[in-house]
Amino acid sequence: MLRRIPLLTCILLVGALSCHAGRAQACTHDNKVERSYLFSDQGRLYDSDPEPTANSSIALTLRACRGDLTAARIEYYDTADASFHRIPMHWVSDDPTGTFDYWQGTVPASRSKKGYRFRVTDGSSTAWLNAAGITSREPSSGDFLIIPGFKTPDWMKNGVMYQIFPDRFYDGDTSNDVTNGQYRYAGCATERHAWGTSVFPKVKGCRTEVFFGGDLAGIDQKLGYIKGTVGADIIYLNPIFMSPSNHKYDTQNYYRVDPAFGTAATLQHLIADIHGSSNGPPGHVILDGVFNHSGDSSCWFGKETYGSISCPEPGAFQSQSSPYYRYYTFQSWPDTYSSFFGFGGMPKLDYGASGSAMRRQIYASKTSVMQTYLRPPYRIDGWRLDVAQSLDADGRDGSDATNHEIMRELRAAVTSVNPDAEILGEFWGDAAAWLDDGKEWDGAMNYNGFTRPISEWICGEDETGKSASINESTLDRRLRASRADLPVGVQETMTNALGTHDTERFATRCGGDIRKVYLGLIFQLTYLGTPAIYYGDEYGMQGGPDPDDRRTFDWSRANTGDAAVALTHKLVSIRGRYSALRTGSYVTLLTDDTRHIYAFGRLDAAHRIAVVLNNASATQTATVPAYQLSMTNGSPVTDLLTGQTYRVSNGNLTVSIEGHYGAILSQ
C-alpha cells in the first residue's frame, strides 16, 4: 500500500515523532544547492517498497536543507519503453531539528526494471543525486534500481553467517577419521595430523592430503557454540561431497557425503538441528556448490582413482564413447582438456547449450544435484556457487552470454523448488553484472566491496597480504561505489567477511594486533550486508596463505571469557536487536583522513545509530554531525558497547573512543 505523508500532521521521520505546521528557514533560495544536506537511499524511510511487486507504486523521499530547494523531481529510466520519465516532487514535512525538508514523489506500478535519480534546483542552481553520489551534471550511471518481483531472502538480510571448513572445525566422530596412508591420490599418501599441529604436509607438494578429522558430527555437536556463544544463525559449509582432498573442491561424487565427514544421514541430522531450536534459534544452511569443474577422480572423468572407488562406466578421459564425454571439453583427447586455472585435477565441466545433459545433471531436473539437496530429506536453504562467473560451455571461462544464460536457468530451477532459497555467487570483482537484474544471483561474496577495502584500511594490506593502504576518504568512496550499482535487497545480502578460506587470516594481515581485529569485527557487524564470520575470526585466529588459513579451531578460545569472542557475541546481539543495523539506511557522517576516524549512520523508523570507528592506535575524541540523523539537541545517546551516555550539543555528538575500536551510538 502506498505510504503518504500529509503536510500538516504528525509524521514519523528518521525514527522521531514530529508535529509541524510550518517551515523554519535553515537555508535560503540563493541559487546554490546545499549538497551536504541532500540525502536519499533505498532504506525504508526513503523508499516505501524497496522490493516491490509489479503492482506496487513506490513513494520516494528526498531530504534537503530546510528552505533550500525551489523544485525537485524524480527522473527514472524505464526499460519498458527505453525512455526517461519525470515526476515532480512536493514538499511533505520538515524534521525535528529544523534542519531538513522532506520531498516526495511516486513512481507508478509496473513490472519493468527502472533506474532513478533525483534532480533538484535552487533557482538557477541544479544538482543530481543518485546511488553514486551528488553531481552538478546529469549522471550517466549509478542510478537507484527498481526491479519489480525480485526479492532476496529476508533470513539473509537479518542473519549472521558462520563459515566452516569442515576438516578443521571439530572431530565429532573419530571412527571416520582419515588415517596415515589410508589411500594415495595424485602420488600423495594421506597424512593424519594431530589437532592443533601444523597444516603443512610432511611430504612436499602433498598439502591437499593432510587431514585432522573434523566432520559433520563435530559441527552438529558445536551448534550450541555457533548459535549461542557466537550468535550466528546461517551456517555456510565449504564442500562436503566425496573427494580425495581435504578441501573437497575436486568433487568425485556430488550425490555422496565424503565418508571422512559422515553419511547422508549425518548431513540430514545436522540440517535438521540447524533448522531446529534445541541448540539456539532456528537457523539456515548453505552448501558450497562446486559446479565449474569436477575432480579428475569423478566417474564422469575417470583419470584418477583412489581408495576402493569403482565406476560402472568409463569416464570421458577413458573413452570417447563414454556417456560423459560431452561433460568436458578436450582440445586433444585425452591429455589436453579445459580445467580450472590449468589444474589438471579439476577438469572443467561443459554446460553445452540450453537443455544439455550437463545442465540437467547440475540444476535443471528434479534429480539434479542442486534440486536434490533443496528437496526432502535434506531441505538446504541455499547454494554458494564456487567461481560462479566461470560456468560455461566449450571450455570458455565465463563472464559471457552463455554464463548469464546458465545463471538465469539455474535461478529459475532453484526458485521453482524454494522461492526463498539463497543463490550466493563467488566473484572477487564488481559482481553487478550478475546482480542488477534480479534474474541470476541474490548476492555475492563481497571481496570487492568489503573484505578488500576494510583490510586495506585497518591492516594496510589487501586480502592476499600484499601491502596496500587507504585513507578514510578513499575507503568511503570505494564502499559507496561498490553499493551504487546494486539493488538494495542485494546490498543487504552481500556477504561481508574479514577473511575466508581463500585469503590470509585477517589477524595475520593486521600483524597479530587483536585491537585491529576488534575494529574489524565492529565494522563487520554494523555495515550494510550479511556479516560472514570465517570460523576462528571471532577470536583472531591467525594464518598465512593457503593452506595456513585453514588451521584447526582452538576450542580453548571458544567462550566469552575470550575478549574477542565476547565482543563478537555482543555485536551479534546488538545487530539482532536493532533493525537499523540490518536493513536501515546508510549515511556517511565523517571521514577524517588526518586522525583516521570514519563514522557512518544507520537509521530506520525505530532507531538512529551512529557508528564511529577509530583506526588510530591512541584513544581519541571524535565529533560527529548528529543532526544528519535528526538527533535533537539535548537528547541522550547511548553507546551500545560501553553503556556510556552522551548528549547531542549544537547538532553534534562528541565521544571518546579507544585506539582501534569503535562506538555504536543509539537513539
How should each PLM-predicted stretch be described?
Residues 1-9:
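Bacterial N-terminal signal peptides that target proteins for export
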Residues 6, 20-165, 171, 177-180, ...:
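Carbohydrate-interacting/catalytic domains
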Residues 8-18:
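Bacterial N-terminal signal peptides
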Residues 64-66, 78, 93, 107-109, ...:
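Short, flexible loop/turn elements at secondary-structure junctions
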Residues 68, 160, 231, 250, ...:
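Short loop/turn motifs at secondary-structure junctions
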Residues 69-72, 270-286, 292-315, 319, ...:
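Active-site-proximal helices and loops of the catalytic beta/alpha 8
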Residues 160-162, 235-237, 285-287, 383, ...:
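Hydrophobic faces of well-ordered beta-strands that scaffold small-molecule active sites
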Residues 166-378, 410-416, 433-434, 455:
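Substrate-binding/active-site clefts of carbohydrate-active enzymes
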